[in-house]
Regions:
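Active-site neighborhood of HAD-like aspartate-dependent phosphohydrolases
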Residues: 1-47
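Asp-based, Mg2+/Mn2+-dependent phosphohydrolase catalytic module
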Residues: 3, 63, 70-84, 93-130, ...
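Non-cysteine beta-strand/loop elements that form the S-adenosyl-L-methionine
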Residues: 5-10, 88-89, 151
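Acidic active-site catalytic centers that drive phospho-/nucleotidyl reactions
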Residues: 8-10, 14, 51, 133, ...
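Gly/Ser/Thr-rich helix-start
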Residues: 12, 32, 55, 59, ...
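Residues that scaffold the ATP/ADP-binding catalytic core of kinase and kinase-like folds
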Residues: 16, 58, 184
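Short, solvent-exposed loop/turn segments at secondary-structure boundaries
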Residues: 24-25, 58-63, 101
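Substrate-recognition element of Asp-dependent hydrolases with the DxDx(T/V) motif
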Residues: 36-72, 81-95, 141
């Protein structure tokens, strides 16, 4: 069985840019390569799970998504932090064109992308985590049956502030960024960076 870190992309790994699809707009968040390398060194597989409604809306193509992921991995590999697999949902139930305007099972918070990952990895859910900056990421991870971390990058800090007001924390851990998420997960599982 393999322990997996499932990762949202935009706002978690890279600076949030509406409908990011051009590599010149890709900016990795501080500490991301170091955190990913640390997870790899701990034996985790790294799997990106990302909704890409820009495909459904006709803003860019699936080839654009794959090319951006290839480029992102190129940048990360230079730092010893390569992603093991990327899964994306190109659909949207309301705002889409042609074959992409559907109610699917892959769009977060559904678990279809996690299930796709199970075709490539022998996922040990008890030792795996979902990390993201939105409640939809947290809900997806919970629906799949893994523990979750909300990061304060992207939309995460605002989400966490709202949840504090409500006194409701649907995530297992909160961390300011991905490197802190690594440290928090290690504390939960007995180590520290």
């Amino acid at each position: 069985m393999e322990k997996v870190i499932f990762l949202d992309r935009d706002g978690t790994l890279n600076v949030e840019v509406n409908y990011l699809h051009r590599k010149e707009d890709l900016v990795l968040l501080p500490g991301v390569p170091e955190a990913l390398k640390a997870f790899k060194d701990q034996g985790y597989k790294l799997v990106v799970i990302t909704n890409q409604a820009g495909v459904a809306r006709g803003y860019y193509t699936e080839d654009d998504v794959r090319e951006l992921h290839r480029y992102m991995n190129e940048l990360l590999a230079e730092r010893g932090a390569e992603i093991d697999a990327f899964y994306y949902c190109p659909h949207h139930p309301e705002h889409g064109i042609g074959k992409y305007k559907i109610q699917c099972r892959c769009r977060k918070p559904e678990t279809g992308m996690f299930e796709m990952a199970e075709q490539d990895f022998d996922v040990d859910k008890a030792s795996s985590w979902m990390i993201g900056d939105k409640l939809i990421d947290i809900e997806a991870g919970r629906n799949y049956g893994v523990r979750t971390v909300l990061v304060g990058t992207g939309y995460g800090a605002g989400v966490h502030d709202e949840q504090k007001k409500k006194g409701d924390f649907p995530y297992d851990l909160y961390a300011d960024d991905l490197l802190e998420a690594y440290n928090e997960i290690n504390r939960e599982t007995a180590g520290n960076l």
